[in-house]
A protein has these predicted regions:
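A short acidic/glycine-rich loop-to-helix N-cap element
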Residues: 389-395
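Short, gly/Ser/Thr-rich active-site loops of penicillin-recognizing serine hydrolases
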Residues: 304-306, 311, 397-429
Length: 429
């Protein structure tokens, strides 16, 4: 039995990692030795001067490792610490065609085709960053404030906000229910109309919307409010899969309190591609597509077997002034981002910072489209446990630079993992 255990543990990557953790902790293996092993086994490419500094002690192991992480010699996927996964979906908002669907980390599918590379497959199975799990189509999180456009349409169509000029006062706290709910801005936003509330991501405005939706004639009824809000989530396609031709997780509309559900919390849970379909409908003012990754299927002679042109699921028939107010608010969101100032294409978007638990950091989301004046594409980015929506927004900016030929690919793929000044103050919106 002992021999069997020993043989199995020798091939158990998880056990080995735990063992090394304790060996490093009690200095059986030093941090410097770990760094040297990474270099000697060609896992990192390092300037000779940095290796010399590590060897002679002028650089300690901690600073050496930090430098490797900043310069991306060691990637988030290799660390497998939060955040280590992300996804991006780009759609043509005029047709519903998916232009790009990206999940990070990825893996080499060629090693699993025409005969499986057993060693590589075992490595994938043990990888704590879970590269075989699609962050774009299977990973689900709360949408956070990116859901507020759904709530905005519900507010106007259900008549709980009487006009686009009606204001709701935000003092920083919503205290009509116990316990009270807070806005991300503790100082409050003052009087907010619908467009301002989107631009400033005012939670109190949307808490009040949820509270009003829940009035059933006898008083506050959260379930009644949820049923009213769900109609609009369904209109945007958020109660069904997006239509893409690969494995996708089922969406989940919130069944928890209406007040937090209107700001994209509660138990709302969606994939990145599902949010992309919703965003596409926002960008094109109400056309909801069943998305498609494929163009067409032909035989060896080029004869058409099947056309995969995306179908229209439904249209959202609301007054154009409501769309205009939503789009204006989304444009104002991006206008506040200093790192979008030099982009010659006008972008509109909505940030989202979604809380899942207190023992891990928040998810970072950014839903956007461009050009603002005449939308062509939408870009949806999510970084699970990514701290701030600004990180997702910067990723989207780089996608726009690439799409509109504003930067070379090499320029976008090189750089460091430093925290830019523009996002050093984290806003929980």
């Amino acid at each position: 039995v002992i021999q069997y255990i020993i043989e199995n543990l020798q091939n158990n990557t998880r056990f080995s990692k735990k063992m090394y953790k304790y060996m490093i902790s009690d200095q059986t293996i030093t941090g410097r030795q770990v760094c040297m092993l990474l270099w000697e086994q060609d896992l990192i490419t390092v300037e000779e001067s940095k290796i010399t500094a590590l060897k002679n002690g002028s650089t300690n192991a901690y600073n050496f490792m930090l430098d490797m992480i900043k310069t991306l010699q060691i990637t988030p996927a290799q660390l497998a610490l939060d955040p280590c996964s992300g996804s991006c979906v780009v759609t043509d908002v005029r047709t519903g065609e998916v232009r790009a669907l990206v999940s990070y980390p990825g893996y080499d599918i060629n090693k699993l085709a025409n005969g499986v590379d057993a060693e590589y497959f075992a490595k994938l199975q043990a990888d704590l960053s879970v590269p075989q799990w699609s962050a774009a189509t299977q990973q689900e999180t709360a949408p956070g404030s990116t859901f507020k456009m759904v709530s905005a349409v519900a507010a106007m169509q259900e008549g709980v906000v009487s006009s686009l000029s009606e204001t709701i006062f935000c003092s920083g706290i919503f205290d009509k229910l116990d316990p009270p709910s807070r806005c991300w801005s503790s100082a409050g936003h003052g009087n907010m109309n619908l467009s301002n509330a989107i631009a400033n991501s005012c939670n109190v405005f949307f808490y009040e919307v949820g509270y009003r939706l829940a009035q059933d004639g006898t008083g506050y009824n959260s379930d009644y409010g949820l049923s009213r809000l769900e109609k609009y989530a369904d209109l945007f396609g958020l109660t069904e899969k997006s239509g893409i031709e690969i494995t996708e997780s089922d969406p989940h509309f919130s069944d928890e309190t209406i007040v937090t559900s209107t700001i994209g919390q509660g138990s709302n849970n969606y994939t990145t591609v599902g949010l992309s379909r919703y965003l596409t409908a926002v960008a094109n003012s109400g056309v909801v597509y069943n998305l498609s990754l494929l163009d067409k299927l032909t035989d060896s002679k080029g004869n058409l077997i099947k056309d995969y042109t995306p179908e229209v699921r439904n249209t959202i028939d609301i007054d154009n002034s409501i769309w205009d107010a939503i789009h204006t608010g989304m444009r104002a969101v991006v206008e506040k981002k200093s790192y979008y100032k030099d982009l010659p294409v006008n972008v509109a978007g909505k940030t989202g910072t979604a809380q899942e638990g207190r023992n891990r950091t928040n998810h970072a989301l950014f839903l956007s489209y461009a050009p603002y004046e005449n939308p062509e594409i939408s870009v949806t980015v999510r970084i699970a446990y990514g701290y701030s929506s600004d990180y997702a927004a910067q990723t989207a900016r780089d996608v726009y630079k690439y799409y509109y030929d504003l930067a070379e690919e090499d320029e976008l793929l090189t750089g460091t993992a430093d925290i830019p000044d523009a996002v050093s103050g984290i806003q929980q919106d």
